[in-house]
Amino acid sequence: MNNGKVRIYELSKELNLDNKELLAICDQLNIAVKSHSSTISESEAESIRAAAEKLAATNGTSKKELNTTSHKPNSAPAGSRNRPAPPQKQQQILEIRKPKILRNTTSNAPEASVANNQIASSEANSPAPPRPFATPVSPMKPTAPSRPVPRNLSETPQKPAAPEAEPEAQSQAPAKIAVEKPEKSAQPRPGKPERQPKPQLVAPPSRPTAEKLDLSEITGAPGEKPILKRDRPRREDERDQAKPRVAKPAQGETSSAPVQKQARPAQGPVKPEQRVNRPGAPSGDGIRPQRPVRPSVDAAPVATPPRGVPGGRGEVGDTAAIAPDLLDLKRPTPPRLAKGGKKWQEEEIIDEIKEKAGKAGVKGKRVKPLVEDDFEDEDLLDEEGLEIPATVQVSLSIARPPKPKAARAATAATAAPISSPTTRGKRSSHNNRDQNRRQETEVKRERPEKVAVTGPMTVQELADLLAVADTEIVKILFMKGMAVSITQNLDIPTITLVGKELEIEVETAEPEAEARKVTEMIEVGDLEHLLRRPPVVTIMGHVDHGKTTLLDSIRKTKVAAGEAGGITQHIGAYHVDIVHDGKEQQIVFLDTPGHEAFTAMRARGARVTDIAVLVVAADDGVRPQTVEAISHAQAAGVPIVVAINKIDKEGAQPDRVKQELTQYGLTPEEWGGETIMVPVSAIKGENLDTLLEMILLVAEVGELSANPDRNARGTVIEAHLDKAKGAVATLLIQNGTLHVGDILLAGSAFGKVRAMVDDRGRRVDIAGPSFAVEVLGLSDVPAAGDEFEVFDNEKEARALASDRADKQRLSRLLQGRVTLTTLSAQAQEGELKELNLILKGDVQGSVEAIVGSLKQIPQNEVQIRMLLTAAGEITETDIDLAAASGAVIIGFNTTFASGARQAADEAGVDVREYNIIYKLIEDIQGALEGLLEPELVEEPLGQTEVRAVFPVGRGAVAGCYVQSGKLVRNCKVRVRRAGKVIYEGVLDSLKRMKDDAREVNAGYECGIGVDKFHDWAEGDIIESYQMVTKRRTLALTR
């Protein structure tokens, strides 16, 4: 207690109370505490002490009452409910204590006489309560079903009940005796009585088999009751210990009532009675001493015979004489309650169950409050006592009109199942929650035995693939001498090494070609309606080899000069009309960029194409993107026509180009191969007609066809967000026909076609197979490469669009997730430098290409965080996001929306605009390098030779000659003798003649002094250098 503060657990020690009891008192006094380690003020502690004293006083009296009363819940509740007769309770308690004295005596006759006297007094004091007690016992039977094992016990008691027809006086006497004995025996050795009663219960069921069936049907699962009996003795002894447990007491309470019932049947067979009586001193007689001792179950059997007469088990229909017997039997139980706090709760629950038997509606309500008040045992006892008398009254009223045996059995059976779930459910609800939590934590992915890797992966991605913690991988590599961070890329050999350490086989799988055709656009139903369609031709090749020039040359030759506007430059898809064999035919061209960043766009072009035209410059030959284009076309399985461009240049060598192409499986026809190669000049227009004829020839061989009489299907070639038009997508129809007004779904973008524009800027209402059109009306910008489809049902299309959008959102969240391990790793390494970027481009393909290039920049120490990548204008929303996150906005071939530039100036947001991807990548790489910590580099200054040594005081000075460079005072020096370094330090003193010098250049002599080194020798070489900071660079990973 420091500074007037007291902790709950200290107060509990002081008051000799359990923490839970003290917390319950705090809750009653409205004192806010969270746990036993919470602190409270001294004033609050005083109020708790006062409440605890009152509670102790009430508990003491209640315990005495319980000891005296034969049945814990019945006696206490009866007195509490029948407030006018509280003195009766005291008298009954005194009588119960007397039976304890009788326990010592083993003779049945004296016990019977004492019991009769006590019964008479108790009946005179409170005749009504006995009947209610009997009825509560019957409800207890229904509750017993919670424990299945005791079923046999319950059944056996029922059989004995029928044969047992003894005088009421006899039953009463044994009841008292049994009650008294169990009290004594249970107190000295609670564990033994529990164990012994269990076997006893099992034995009786075997004797009464026929009646057992009936009883089981009636009670449902009365067998549990015997188990409850055994528990009661335990609980009496454990009362103080078990107080915190609420669920168990509930079960014990329900079980106590069934135990008494079992005692009733056991009365017939003397042996079962003796077994059960172990806890409660049963006499050898067949009398029902077990029934009186609820724990022992001896007294209950005595009362059962009369009950059986009026109402099957005598639960409801008991005679007035039987009621007193029951009272006597119940009286023995209260002592047990006094012993165990849990038993009080159990008996209270039993009383509630009895009430439930009387009225089914009350059952659930009773149990719930008990569970809520788990920690307030004594309060519960008082409250339960009050409620129990009410139950007794109800049972008495019901008992007056005895019900038929069958009806009683049915009610008991129904009551039992209902009550048992309540007690069971209360106890199991917490367990279920714990089990669920355990299952959630235990749900771990099993470590795979084999994984396939297609390329480098980050530590985090590898950890997810191998189902291990990323810190485990960092630890493994650290033990191998490699210090890596969570976000560092690991190459395949390193991944294999990690897999070997974890005993996981790592296979290197070939990455799936992006250009491979995934979806077959023509379905089985289209086969009977196929018609010839124009070929789709993709022009591919290296940068600056003349692809776009070649396409422009073809169009200028074949397109009327006055056509409006020509092409919308973003589309990259155009159609050309030519005359071949006297027929007018069309060819659709797709133009792809040649820069290395546009790999995905080239792959997309190859995937949707029918023929690939490979443009190679005659003066440059095969280049990296040429090789990539060949691999895309081969992966897509499309024929290749080679156009050798720039043959008009002086350095053109078409044959050398053909020779280089043979290394990649492209052998010209004139050399015996199958590849068509046409030398052309895009600028002069040479051999363009030959090239077009060859394209049509290859198309005829391929027999290209589609079904125009169906809903359109195809691929999104390009997409962007237009300021005036909204989402604009360039679609290539590969099968079917697209009409204005069609319901279109492209990826997760849903919409209705509002307008279509062809490559020449004309609005069209219909677009057939192989045509490329710009479509307006989509709700969102689809991703380039997505497949689109037309639906007849708008509802179906919307549902599918919503599902796809949800999946995309989930994948984005998973990619952007930050784990605790990554955060801790960043903390250990110091703050991880990040460059936040917002990227806006003119079209989706450009954005995709830029993101792909940025991913190639190594990000071990600095990282690029793409907050937003989208096609469209730079808007005020982008400016707000950048201002909030400290991001830089990158615009590629795009513009500002109205007000965005002003907002950027006001917010101080850095906006960079580019139209060349090379420059953009270089600037971002430079910004990342600027975030890197500069490294210290050794910069040599000069070399000096020692030619003389002059002793000065205790040290020495070297007379030196500067051979090269210069010497600077306070620079770092390294002294070498015979090629070995003998000293490294700082040059402390530098003199020229007798004056201090700041530096001495080559060709001059000087004196050198070093405070910590005096062992100079002629011929030593002094190397001077200084440490300078150098900007670090990042190399792009290829």
Curated annotation (Swiss-Prot):
Name recorded for this polypeptide: Translation initiation factor IF-2
Nucleotide-binding listed as a keyword: yes
Chain segments carrying region G3: 591-594
Matches recorded under HAMAP family: IF_2_B (MF_00100_B)
Taxonomic source organism: Trichormus variabilis (strain ATCC 29413 / PCC 7937)
Places the protein is found: Cytoplasm
The keyword Lipid metabolism is assigned to this record: no
Composition skew (Basic and acidic residues), residue ranges: 178-197, 226-243, 431-450
Disordered, as annotated region: 39-346, 403-451
InterPro entries: EF-G-like_DII, IF2_II, IF2_N, P-loop_NTPase, Small_GTP-bd, T_Tr_GTP-bd_dom, TF_IF2_bacterial-like, TIF_IF2
PROSITE patterns cross-referenced by the UniProt entry: G_TR_2, IF2
